[in-house]
C-alpha cells in the first residue's frame, strides 16, 4: 500500500513539473513575440514535450494562454497584498495606486500579458484582482467618504492607474510627478475629506466655578 501511495505521489509531482515547464515555455514565447506568434509546436520544442501532453494538461492553446495569464494575475494580486495597507481607507487607496504602478514597471512583460488579450469573460483570477480594488473603494464608502457609487469609482480609478502604468511601460514616460497628480486628482474627485473630530462642549466643573 505504501509503495502504491509513493508511486501516486511521484506521478503527481512529475505531472506538476511538466505543467510548470509548459507554462514557463509558453510565457517565454508570449513575452518575446506575442499571442499571434504562439504555436503548440514551438511550445513543445521549448518545453521538450509532445502535443498530446499539452492537450492532456491544458485542453487547447486558448486554455494554455489563459493559465499563463491567470498565473500573472495571481502574482500581481499577491504582490499588492504583501504590504499592510494604511488604516485610513483613502490612504489605503492612495497606497494601492502606487503599488499597482510599481508592480507594472517591475514586471512589464507580465503586465502586458495580463491586459493585452481580449477576453469575453474574465477568469476568476482576473476578477479576484479587480475585487481587491473594489474592496478598497467600498471601505471608503463604508465611512461615508465616497462621492459616487462604488462600482463607478472603482472603474474610474482603475482606468486612471492602468492608463498611467500602460503609458509608462510603452515608453511615453509620464513620470512620477504626473502619476501623483493623476492619483491625487482622482482621489479628490471621488472622495470627501475626513470630518474634523467634534470638540466636547461639556465645561469642566472647575471652569464653571471660576467663572461664577
Where are the predicted features?
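N-terminal intrinsically disordered/low-complexity leader segments
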Residues: 1-17, 28, 196-212
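Short coil/turn segments at alpha/beta junctions that flank glycine-rich nucleotide-binding fingerprints
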Residues: 32-36, 107, 143
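Hydrophobic alpha-helical connector segments
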Residues: 67, 81-110, 121, 130, ...
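Pre-recognition alpha-helix immediately N-terminal to the DNA-recognition helix
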Residues: 21-29, 75, 95, 99
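Short, basic, alpha-helical segments at the C-terminal edge of helix-turn-helix-like DNA-binding modules
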Residues: 70-77
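Helix-turn-helix
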Residues: 21, 25, 29-63, 67
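Short alpha-helical functional segments enriched in proximate histidine and acidic residues
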Residues: 29, 79, 103, 136
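Hydrophobic/aromatic-rich alpha-helical bundle segments in the mid-to-C-terminal region
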Residues: 112-116, 122-130, 140-187, 197-206, ...
